[in-house]
């Protein structure tokens, strides 16, 4: 991409994190104020942009540039995305996101949450 969307509309909150949450993982709410990894193309609430000492900084809105994805159906435009583990996938029951860039060689995409 020849333009930068870094910083666009970012909104980050700090929540407790389950042990399997890593930086870059799409996450879902798993309890009161706690996030964990998604399973089976579940809708995610945000992306973990920082993880430390049992807490995660979760980006809930804005541009995220290097989201790993798997499967087909991830393309530029509005796409419903769910997640399985640390990867996004096109999913009917997913969250509508604006996909602004797709790198098929690296299997990553840039999205606006």
Task: For each feature predicted by the language model, list its residue ranges.
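Surface-exposed, low-hydrophobicity beta-strand/loop segments enriched in small/polar/acidic residues
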Residues: 1-113
